[in-house]
A protein has these predicted regions:
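N-terminal "pre-motor" subdomain/linker immediately upstream of P-loop NTPase catalytic cores
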Residues: 75-79, 85-184
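P-loop NTP-binding catalytic core
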Residues: 160-230, 236
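Short flexible coil/turn linkers enriched for glycine and charged/polar residues
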Residues: 106-108, 116-120, 130-132, 148-152, ...
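P-loop NTPase nucleotide-binding module
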Residues: 208-265, 304
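Charged, low-complexity terminal tails
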Residues: 1-107, 120, 129, 134
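Phosphate-interacting basic helix/loop segments used at nucleotide- and nucleic-acid interfaces
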Residues: 99-110, 211-215, 303-308, 357
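P-loop NTPase catalytic core
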Residues: 237, 246-249, 258-280, 284-479
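Flexible glycine-/small-residue-rich
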Residues: 114-118, 126-128, 140, 158, ...
């Protein structure tokens, strides 16, 4: 069939796809049209086979019932047949039962994330949110009837109706995102929820926590629904800071669903984070630097949809992403050229999806929140990275700025306290904390950056917790 489609022109393929109801054909290339047609052929073949199996089973049941009713009473008292005839019948029954067992296997339990395709059908993915050999087909009728969406975690039963089927089909659905199927059908769409400013604080400070967490907790407080950026030069400690935030969240908020998304990252960093951050509600999703840009793009989109589905169930979700800059680079290589180019070779169209991802962070009035903390790279020697940062600069409502000059002087954490901060932090800090931060920021005026940070770090080191630090600042009226 592939050869037949490939022999046709793109215009003819487009007409065929249009007549079959395939969406988004105007932007597809010939190879994409061929794949879409083949995918629909496979989906239709699977549906047809499922219907045939159901009809065959119903017909067999009816025939058995009729034969049982019409059987004469004397037949039940008939003597045993000759041994050779009995042997032949037994052999025939065994052959039929063997064929039936290979044709329709026993249902198996399946669990994974749903990806709905353009043509309406879907697949349950299992490994790292990406296609694999053990994916499960979900029929369009099931998706429409149960209001299923990309990003839903489905638990149910599957089986192959034919040995030649590439994928098993979903036969029974038990839960959607851990909730009853009926609840999923009645949920409100993410886009219809009302976003408000973060007003519930996520405290990163805990007994025995590092100075970095104590500083971030006061200088750039994080609330549920925050959209924050960790701006860093190379080797300034952004990944370490992200890891410490993840540890604090898993310890203090075990019910919060934490997704760590690593894009274009080193494989050893992925292993380190997976082993360091563990919990019942923790997912580490990754796409290492040796993968194609399309792989980065697909993984990030699945993570975004997964988080939205959880928020629709009024869950609190946090995504820690490293990094938004590398995601923008991946989209710059995959989007169709718009004909315009910014400094550094960046296509403006490449920023749409990264902004959509980052902009999904919000606190919902109806309940639930999506918090996103993403790292952004600056001063890498690439003009494109600086342009990406400038484009995202005003979109967040919280920033932590790391300075490599401080780290080179062995000042850790290398946080530029003067430039870091949170919008509307009055909704998150109490009066004593606000007053102490005002005193601290006023005292930094006129001081060199490294001197000010060292002085503040010294004071943090001589206090056991933030409460003690605030009391000391308010008492002395200086830091």
């Amino acid at each position: 069939m592939r050869e037949k489609y490939e022999s046709l022109s793109a215009a003819v393929l487009r007409e065929l796809a249009k007549s079959r109801g395939i969406k988004g054909i105007s932007s597809m290339k010939k190879s994409q049209l061929v794949e879409a047609m083949l995918a629909q052929d496979e989906a239709e073949a699977t549906e047809t086979k499922m219907e045939e199996v159901e009809k065959k089973e119903e017909h067999t049941k009816e025939r058995t019932t009729v034969a049982h009713r019409n059987r004469p009473a004397s037949e039940g008292r008939r003597e045993h047949r000759p041994s050779n005839e009995h042997h032949d019948n037994t052999r025939t029954e065994r052959t039929e039962s063997t064929a039936d067992s290979s044709y329709a296997e026993e249902p198996k339990r399946c669990e994974g994330i749903l990806e709905v395709m353009q043509d309406g059908f879907g697949f349950i993915r299992s490994d790292n949110y990406l296609p694999g050999d053990h994916d499960v087909y979900v029929a369009p009728a099931q998706i429409r009837r149960l209001n299923l969406k990309t990003g839903d975690i489905l638990v149910g039963k599957t089986k192959r109706n034919n040995p030649t089927d590439k994928f098993g089909a979903l036969m029974q659905l038990d839960t959607v995102n851990g909730f009853a199927v009926e609840e999923a059908a009645k949920r409100t769409n993410f886009e219809d929820l009302t976003p408000i400013f973060p007003n519930q604080r996520i405290r990163l400070e805990q007994p025995g926590s590092s100075v970095a967490m104590r500083i971030v907790d006061l200088v750039s407080p994080i609330g549920k629904g925050q959209r924050g950026m960790i701006v860093s030069q190379p080797k300034a400690g952004k990944t370490t800071l992200l890891k410490e935030i993840a540890k604090s969240v898993t310890t203090s908020y075990p019910d919060m669903h934490l997704i760590i998304l690593l894009i274009d990252e080193r494989p050893e960093e992925v292993t380190d984070i997976r082993e360091a951050i563990q919990g019942d509600n923790v997912e580490v999703i990754y796409s290492t630097f040796d993968e194609l840009p399309e792989h980065h793009k697909r993984v990030s989109e699945m993570v975004m949809e997964r988080a939205k589905r959880l928020v629709e169930h009024k869950k609190d979700v946090m995504i820690l992403m490293d990094s938004i800059t590398r995601l923008a680079r991946a989209y710059n290589l995959t989007v169709p050229p718009s004909g315009r180019t910014l400094s550094g070779g960046l296509d403006p169209a490449a920023l749409h999806m990264p902004k959509k991802f980052f902009g999904a962070a919000r606190n919902m009035r109806e309940g639930g929140s999506l918090t996103i903390l993403a790292t952004a790279l600056v001063d890498t020697g690439s003009k494109m990275d600086d342009v990406v940062f400038e484009e995202f600069k005003g979109t967040g409502n919280m920033e932590v700025i790391l300075d490599r000059k401080l780290s080179e002087k062995r000042v850790f954490p290398a946080i530029d306290i003067a430039k870091s901060g949170t919008r509307r932090d009055d909704l998150l800090l109490n009066k004593e904390e606000q007053e102490a931060m005002e005193i601290m920021r006023r005292g930094m005026n006129g001081m060199r950056k490294d001197e000010a940070v060292e002085s503040i770090l010294n004071m943090f080191a001589h206090t056991r917790n933030n409460k003690e630090y605030i009391a000391k600042v308010l008492r002395s009226r200086m830091f």
